[in-house]
Protein backbone atom coordinates (compact mmCIF):
# COMPACT_ATOMS: atom_id res chain seq x y z
CA UNK A 1 0.00 0.00 0.00
CA UNK A 2 2.84 2.41 0.74
CA UNK A 3 3.64 2.62 -2.97
CA UNK A 4 0.03 3.60 -3.79
CA UNK A 5 -0.62 6.41 -1.30
CA UNK A 6 0.99 9.32 0.48
CA UNK A 7 0.18 9.51 4.20
CA UNK A 8 -0.70 12.97 5.57
CA UNK A 9 -1.86 14.10 8.99
CA UNK A 10 -3.91 16.98 10.33
CA UNK A 11 -3.49 19.02 13.48
CA UNK A 12 -7.04 20.37 13.40
CA UNK A 13 -8.87 19.82 16.69
CA UNK A 14 -12.65 19.66 17.06
CA UNK A 15 -12.66 22.46 19.63
CA UNK A 16 -10.96 24.76 17.07
CA UNK A 17 -13.84 24.45 14.61
CA UNK A 18 -16.31 27.30 14.52
CA UNK A 19 -19.27 25.50 12.98
CA UNK A 20 -22.02 27.67 11.66
CA UNK A 21 -22.84 25.03 9.00
CA UNK A 22 -22.74 27.79 6.41
CA UNK A 23 -19.25 26.99 5.20
CA UNK A 24 -18.75 25.36 1.85
CA UNK A 25 -16.10 22.83 2.89
CA UNK A 26 -16.75 19.62 4.84
CA UNK A 27 -14.88 18.69 8.01
CA UNK A 28 -14.53 14.96 8.67
CA UNK A 29 -14.32 13.53 12.16
CA UNK A 30 -14.66 10.05 13.64
CA UNK A 31 -18.40 9.97 12.92
CA UNK A 32 -18.27 11.33 9.38
CA UNK A 33 -18.96 14.92 8.37
CA UNK A 34 -19.09 16.96 11.58
CA UNK A 35 -19.07 20.55 10.31
CA UNK A 36 -18.95 22.91 7.35
CA UNK A 37 -16.33 25.66 7.38
CA UNK A 38 -14.98 28.35 5.09
CA UNK A 39 -11.49 26.93 4.50
CA UNK A 40 -10.03 23.55 3.63
CA UNK A 41 -6.85 21.54 4.18
CA UNK A 42 -7.02 19.07 1.29
CA UNK A 43 -8.26 19.26 -2.28
CA UNK A 44 -7.74 15.73 -3.61
CA UNK A 45 -9.88 12.64 -3.16
CA UNK A 46 -8.54 10.66 -0.22
CA UNK A 47 -9.10 7.76 2.12
CA UNK A 48 -9.36 8.68 5.80
CA UNK A 49 -8.31 6.14 8.40
CA UNK A 50 -9.26 6.82 12.01
CA UNK A 51 -6.08 6.35 14.01
CA UNK A 52 -7.17 6.87 17.64
CA UNK A 53 -9.90 5.62 19.91
CA UNK A 54 -12.43 2.83 19.94
CA UNK A 55 -13.15 3.25 16.23
CA UNK A 56 -9.48 3.12 15.22
CA UNK A 57 -9.29 1.58 11.76
CA UNK A 58 -12.61 2.99 10.53
CA UNK A 59 -12.34 3.98 6.85
CA UNK A 60 -14.01 6.98 5.20
CA UNK A 61 -13.86 8.38 1.68
CA UNK A 62 -13.45 12.12 1.16
CA UNK A 63 -13.70 13.92 -2.15
CA UNK A 64 -13.38 17.50 -3.30
CA UNK A 65 -12.08 20.12 -0.89
CA UNK A 66 -12.28 19.19 2.79
CA UNK A 67 -10.62 19.29 6.21
CA UNK A 68 -9.98 16.49 8.67
CA UNK A 69 -9.81 16.41 12.46
CA UNK A 70 -6.45 15.21 13.75
CA UNK A 71 -7.72 11.79 14.83
CA UNK A 72 -7.43 10.46 11.27
CA UNK A 73 -4.64 9.98 8.76
CA UNK A 74 -5.26 11.09 5.21
CA UNK A 75 -4.14 8.68 2.49
CA UNK A 76 -3.86 10.47 -0.84
CA UNK A 77 -3.38 8.25 -3.88
CA UNK A 78 -0.24 9.01 -5.84
CA UNK A 79 0.43 8.72 -9.56
CA UNK A 80 -3.26 8.97 -10.48
CA UNK A 81 -4.25 5.82 -8.60
CA UNK A 82 -8.04 5.61 -8.24
CA UNK A 83 -9.02 6.81 -4.74
CA UNK A 84 -12.51 5.32 -4.77
CA UNK A 85 -11.22 1.89 -5.79
CA UNK A 86 -8.52 2.06 -3.08
CA UNK A 87 -11.22 2.99 -0.55
CA UNK A 88 -13.25 -0.09 -1.43
CA UNK A 89 -10.13 -2.29 -1.40
CA UNK A 90 -9.12 -0.96 2.02
CA UNK A 91 -12.54 -1.82 3.45
CA UNK A 92 -11.42 -5.46 3.21
CA UNK A 93 -8.43 -4.88 5.50
CA UNK A 94 -8.81 -6.02 9.11
CA UNK A 95 -7.28 -3.09 10.97
CA UNK A 96 -7.92 -4.70 14.38
CA UNK A 97 -4.67 -6.63 14.03
CA UNK A 98 -2.79 -3.31 13.94
CA UNK A 99 -4.34 -1.76 17.06
CA UNK A 100 -1.90 -1.05 19.88
CA UNK A 101 -2.34 0.53 23.29
CA UNK A 102 -4.32 -0.62 26.29
CA UNK A 103 -6.22 2.53 27.27
CA UNK A 104 -6.89 4.29 23.99
CA UNK A 105 -6.23 2.08 20.98
CA UNK A 106 -4.11 3.50 18.14
CA UNK A 107 -3.12 2.30 14.71
CA UNK A 108 -0.13 3.55 12.76
CA UNK A 109 0.38 3.77 9.01
CA UNK A 110 3.84 2.23 9.35
CA UNK A 111 2.19 -0.95 10.64
CA UNK A 112 -0.41 -1.41 7.89
CA UNK A 113 1.49 0.24 5.02
CA UNK A 114 2.82 -3.14 3.89
CA UNK A 115 -0.72 -4.46 3.22
CA UNK A 116 -1.09 -5.71 -0.34
CA UNK A 117 -3.93 -4.29 -2.43
CA UNK A 118 -5.13 -5.94 -5.61
CA UNK A 119 -5.10 -3.29 -8.34
CA UNK A 120 -6.54 -4.66 -11.62
CA UNK A 121 -6.66 -2.94 -14.99
CA UNK A 122 -8.81 0.16 -15.46
CA UNK A 123 -11.78 -1.66 -17.01
CA UNK A 124 -12.02 -4.10 -14.10
CA UNK A 125 -11.48 -1.33 -11.52
CA UNK A 126 -14.26 0.74 -13.05
CA UNK A 127 -16.63 -2.23 -13.08
CA UNK A 128 -15.84 -3.14 -9.46
CA UNK A 129 -16.12 0.48 -8.37
CA UNK A 130 -19.47 0.93 -10.14
CA UNK A 131 -20.99 -2.17 -8.54
CA UNK A 132 -19.74 -1.32 -5.05
CA UNK A 133 -20.81 2.32 -5.35
CA UNK A 134 -24.29 1.16 -6.34
CA UNK A 135 -24.48 -1.12 -3.29
CA UNK A 136 -23.11 1.61 -1.04
CA UNK A 137 -25.76 4.06 -2.29
CA UNK A 138 -28.51 1.46 -1.85
CA UNK A 139 -27.28 0.73 1.68
CA UNK A 140 -27.39 4.44 2.57
CA UNK A 141 -30.98 4.68 1.30
CA UNK A 142 -31.98 1.59 3.30
CA UNK A 143 -30.38 3.03 6.46
CA UNK A 144 -32.33 6.29 6.04
CA UNK A 145 -35.55 4.32 5.51
CA UNK A 146 -34.87 2.21 8.60
CA UNK A 147 -34.24 5.32 10.67
CA UNK A 148 -37.50 6.89 9.46
CA UNK A 149 -39.42 3.69 10.26
CA UNK A 150 -37.88 3.54 13.74
CA UNK A 151 -38.98 7.12 14.39
CA UNK A 152 -42.46 6.30 13.13
CA UNK A 153 -42.60 3.23 15.39
CA UNK A 154 -41.54 5.29 18.41
CA UNK A 155 -44.20 7.90 17.64
CA UNK A 156 -46.93 5.27 17.22
CA UNK A 157 -45.96 3.47 20.42
CA UNK A 158 -45.96 6.75 22.30
CA UNK A 159 -49.38 7.64 20.85
CA UNK A 160 -50.81 4.28 21.93
CA UNK A 161 -49.92 4.74 25.58
CA UNK A 162 -50.81 8.39 26.23
Q: Could you say what each language-model-derived stretch is?
A:
Residues 13-14, 103-104, 113-119:
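Short, recurring structural edge motifs at helix starts
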Residues 3-6, 87-91, 158:
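Generic alpha-helical structural context detector
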Residues 1-12, 17-28:
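Non-catalytic DNA-recognition/assembly elements of restriction-modification systems
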Residues 29-91, 100-104, 108-112:
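A short beta-sheet element
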Residues 15-18, 99-102, 143-147:
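A short, aromatic/hydrophobic, helix- or strand-capping loop or linear motif
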Residues 118-162:
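Amphipathic alpha-helical coiled-coil/heptad-repeat segments
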